[in-house]
Amino acid sequence: MSHSYDYDAIVIGSGPGGEGAAMGLVKQGARVAVIERYHNVGGGCTHWGTIPSKALRHAVSRIIEFNQNPLYSDHSRLLRSSFADILNHADTVINQQTRMRQGFYERNHCEILQGDAHFVDEHTLALKCHDGSVETITAEKFVIACGSRPYHPDDVDFSHPRVYDSDSILSLHHEPRHVLIYGAGVIGCEYASIFRGMEVKVDLINTRDRLLAFLDQEMSDSLSYHFWNSGVVIRHNEEYERIEACDDGVIMHLKSGKKLKADCLLYANGRTGNTDSLALENIGLTTDSRGQLKVNSMYQTALPHIYAVGDVIGYPSLASAAYDQGRIAAQALVKGEATAHLIEDIPTGIYTIPEISSVGKTEQQLTSMKVPYEVGRAQFKHLARAQIVGMSVGTLKILFHRETKEILGIHCFGERAAEIIHIGQAIMEQKGGGNTIEYFVNTTFNYPTMAEAYRVAALNGLNRLF
């Protein structure tokens, strides 16, 4: 690469996508700087998104597990924790993650520049530092990995102390008894689980006709039933007319004529790419209405020397995929092409209580494609390990081709679903006939384990063939 620039490459953002790109670049010998606008590395994933919300979920799920365990049923009072106490656990995890990720950059001699950056021209950035000074830095190539933030419609007053988004909810300073959650996507459903697990009343407003429509319908229905059974009130096909924030709560007026009141509102309906501060107009790049950039298969934007990865390019908007996108972009940036690519079937993990995870095709997709598939199921309540740990709610479903026995999709609802799914994913990725449901019948599993669900489901499915 040319040495007429300050750096071979500058990465804007230190979340999963930026980290993946930066590590991939320095490992190939590039001179790299990473720009981070906040005081600590890690991006939204570490500080406001994946890590804190999953730490919250874990703490709440352990409280639920204790309170429902028959071993402790003789205790006269239930175990409870305040939201502030649980947030302390999340803060501990965030600090550990931040220190670890800071170490990655230090060990690999990757320079971190703190401040807000915007493009001056196609090879120059202006960096406004925290002390107010402005520096000009240049690079031959760039990776935009600045992530996303919660979408804020203009008619919702997010400055009001009773109105939160998925970032600011982590600064909740009071103990709500009733929460309105607008938006029943992944974030909305995860926080509905968290609040309901803390015995908070939850109204979940869904703008669509069912929860998480991208899931296999049985998984979506299982979540809906579990929410209903735990007391979450779900209102489908609703949109707000206006939101009225008061001193003691929030009133939501729906277009259907309904009115809802709660102690606070969590608005969780969509996200926006953090591109508005980059002055992309100075280099001729444009974004869509949600601030997202279009890229090709090597993550190049319309300007070939500028790449973009992670939430800022939209789907799949997963931390796991963003890291891989960063590594692929780094390879393309240095070598001019990328031999690596994202796998076709990216697993999804939804950290509700219980978890949901899936990989591959759904029943609805296979039916519309007219694929002759069969279904194998295992109920967690029949597994010795689930009975031992008292987590009998859940199911594993394997979809496979009736004729070739090839696994086409795996769907799991229950505790540890996001871990369990990877066993099946590993077999699905096998080539040369290695992807077969018969693997689970012919292998030996540790006993007792949750992994045994694969053998149970495989036998159940194969027994349906004739």
Curated annotation (Swiss-Prot):
| Pfam families attached to this UniProt entry | Pyr_redox_2, Pyr_redox_dim
Cellular component annotations (GO), alphabetically ordered: cytosol
- Superkingdom of this entry's organism? Bacteria
**BP-aspect Gene Ontology terms:** 2-oxoglutarate metabolic process; NADP metabolic process
**UniProt entry keywords in alphabetical sequence:** Cytoplasm, FAD, Flavoprotein, NAD, NADP, Oxidoreductase
Tell me which InterPro entries the record gives. Class-I_Pyr_Nuc-Dis_Oxidored, FAD/NAD-bd_sf, FAD/NAD-binding_dom, FAD/NAD-linked_Rdtase_dimer_sf, Pyr_nuc-diS_OxRdtase, Pyr_nucl-diS_OxRdtase_dimer, STH_gammaproteobact
Look up the EC number in the record and give it. Answer: 1.6.1.1
Q: What is its main location?
A: cytoplasm
This protein's record includes keyword 4Fe-4S? no
**Needed cofactors:** FAD
Presence of keyword Lyase: no
SUPFAM superfamilies, alphabetized: FAD/NAD(P)-binding domain, FAD/NAD-linked reductases, dimerisation (C-terminal) domain
EC primary class: oxidoreductase
Instruction: Describe cofactor binding as the record notes it.
Output: Binds 1 FAD per subunit.
Q: Indicate which residues the UniProt annotation says bind FAD.
A: 36-45
Catalytic reaction(s) noted:
NAD(+) + NADPH = NADH + NADP(+)
Name where it's found: Cytoplasm
Please name the PANTHER family in this protein's record.
DISULFIDE OXIDOREDUCTASE, SOLUBLE PYRIDINE NUCLEOTIDE TRANSHYDROGENASE
User: Which family is it part of?
Assistant: Belongs to the class-I pyridine nucleotide-disulfide oxidoreductase family.
Q: What does the protein in this record do?
A: Conversion of NADPH, generated by peripheral catabolic pathways, to NADH, which can enter the respiratory chain for energy generation.
Q: Kindly provide the name given to this protein in its UniProt entry.
A: Soluble pyridine nucleotide transhydrogenase
Q: Which organism encodes this protein?
A: Enterobacter sp. (strain 638)
Chain's gene name: sthA
